[in-house]
Amino acid sequence: WQRPLVTVKIGGQLKEALLDTGADNTVFEDINLPGRWKPKMIGGIGGFVKVRQYEQIPIEICGHKVIGTVLIGPTPANIIGRDLMTQLGCTLNF
């Protein structure tokens, strides 16, 4: 069983990300996004982490374009959460 890794274009930059139906939010690490951000706390595996929340970020996944909220902060892997997957109409059935 392999993790569903996809290449996504986020704010014009290409990144590898993990499709995660267990995650509510989309979280990336080491990426610079334009515009204003606001601080947010999210619960992760190791407790709560402070992240930067960017709104209205263009994201392209496998040719599908969506505009959504992206969180930037420390994460073990770049994660596409349910918030964007529902916009894509993407379901993962295991």
Regions from the language model: what does each represent?
Residues K9-F94:
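Aspartic protease
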Residues W1-V8:
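Charged, flexible boundary elements
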